[in-house]
Amino acid sequence: MAQVLTQFDTIAAISTPIGEGGISIVRLSGEDAVAIANKLFKGADLTQVPSHTIHYGHIVDPKTKDVVDETMVSVLRAPKTFTREDMVEINCHGGMIVTNDILQLLLANGARMADPGEFTKRAFMNGRIDLTQAESVMDIVRAKTDKSRQVAMTQLAGGLLDKIRTMRQELLDTMAHEEVNIDYPEYDMDDLTSQEMKKKAEEVSKQIDQLLKTAQEGKIIRNGLATAIVGRPNVGKSSLLNYLTQDDKAIVTDIAGTTRDTLEEYVSVKGVPLKLIDTAGIHHTEDKVEKIGVERSKKAIAEADLVLLLLDASQDLTDEDKNLLNLTANKKRIIILNKQDLGTKISQEMIREITDNPIIVTSILKQENMAALENAIEQLFFSGIENSQNQILVTNQRQAGLLAKAKQSLEDVVNGIDDAMPLDLVQIDLKNAWDTLGEITGESAPDELITQLFSQFCLGK
């Protein structure tokens, strides 16, 4: 864990969204947090109250003596706080003016405006959390479904941290054993030590493999299942988007080519996080703007985790339909036969001869059989991840990339031993793997990485 650092100044920020609301919270952290808040607070003497208590009073401008707001103030003393520093949280009435006035008074009386993510960064620097837990804090804030929140909570509880630390300890024990052999060569334990190193490298590599297998699942749960809504013009793509989002996010008309670009929307369908992409109709066109939309649609299909392919069941299968069936043949997809209320010229049996993908017959405008579509999405998504609530998942590209890098170093260890390389050289690769795993938790992460990571957080967090 990172070194405990205590020589920080005192920071302040608004921790709740700016705007009208019932309550806003202005947060302080640092050695002088209580003293600064006490300059403004008229009620109890905050410097004398017990830790983890809340007090009623008023925030008063020390210079003008004007009462700014009626508040409840929480005093939280180190080390049992989020940042492991003294903290104060001022609960005031929601509203842009009053909240900002309180913040400005805190800044005028000795606090500094917090950088984005600085509260969480201090929690990391003071050993309260590691980098995987810090990332999970933002995952909780940004969670779009219960599933993504549950996975983030598992990370915050230290699931991935414990796994990484166990692997690092195993590698450290192996390196320590090898150091004895290097320091005392008279015992001639090279063969024994090399086999031990190889075995341990292979064991840890397998553990990393198991984590890497969860990376795609973790990405989907964290970011949403990238779902492309695909079909030729005027088959009901935008109507499907509007049904799933329960909002008119796309223009629905009878004019072919109305959607000229890709539209994105996040929704939860029966607990499945979907990042919906309503694509432009893929068809031949001479319109330059439409051509751009068509190319973007093809790119969206290539990058999609799931394709919802719409066909107009009331019309014969067209060449454009056949092209889309071929274009999406290798994707996980659901075939939707829309407009069945207008007649049926494309049957399930006809499509079944082409593919074994799930087929849903519906009228989206009349919302007929839409529950079957939602059930099909749920079944496809949860078929292999029913236990992900308590499962340790790799949830972002940073973690996955470092795991892959560590695995490569371990493979270099195995190859080096097989090629009879000197053990002191092989151990360099073993230490590289150990260091790389430490970057995941922050135990060996460079300062610039830590700064960059926390800069992505919101103010007040």
From Swiss-Prot:
Localization in the cell: Cytoplasm
UniProt cofactor note: Binds 1 potassium ion per subunit.
Biological role: Exhibits a very high intrinsic GTPase hydrolysis rate. Involved in the addition of a carboxymethylaminomethyl (cmnm) group at the wobble position (U34) of certain tRNAs, forming tRNA-cmnm(5)s(2)U34.
Protein name (record): tRNA modification GTPase MnmE
Known partners and oligomeric status: Homodimer. Heterotetramer of two MnmE and two MnmG subunits.
Record EC number: 3.6.-.-
Gene (name only): mnmE
Binding sites annotated in the UniProt record for (6S)-5-formyl-5,6,7,8-tetrahydrofolate: R27, E89, R128, K461
Gene Ontology biological process terms from the UniProt entry: tRNA methylation; tRNA wobble uridine modification
Residues reported to bind GTP: 234-239, 253-259, 278-281
Entry GO CC: cytosol
Residues that hold K(+) according to the record: N234, T253, I255, T258
Matching Gene3D superfamilies: P-loop containing nucleotide triphosphate hydrolases (3.40.50.300), Probable tRNA modification gtpase trme, domain 1 (3.30.1360.120), tRNA modification GTPase MnmE domain 2 (1.20.120.430)
Binding site for Mg(2+): S238, T259
Domain named TrmE-type G: residues: 224-382
Stored PANTHER family: TRNA MODIFICATION GTPASE GTPBP3, TRNA MODIFICATION GTPASE GTPBP3, MITOCHONDRIAL
Entry keyword set: Cytoplasm, GTP-binding, Hydrolase, Magnesium, Metal-binding, Nucleotide-binding, Potassium, tRNA processing
Entries under InterPro entries matching the protein: G_TrmE, GTP-bd, GTP-bd_TrmE_N, GTPase_MnmE, MnmE_dom2, MnmE_helical, P-loop_NTPase, Small_GTP-bd
GO MF assignments: GTP binding; GTPase activity; metal ion binding
Keyword Nucleotide-binding in annotation: yes
Cofactor: K(+)
Keyword Cytoplasm: yes
Transmembrane segments: none
Pfam families hit by this protein: MMR_HSR1, MnmE_helical, TrmE_N
Highest taxon listed in the record's lineage: Bacteria
Family statement: Belongs to the TRAFAC class TrmE-Era-EngA-EngB-Septin-like GTPase superfamily. TrmE GTPase family.
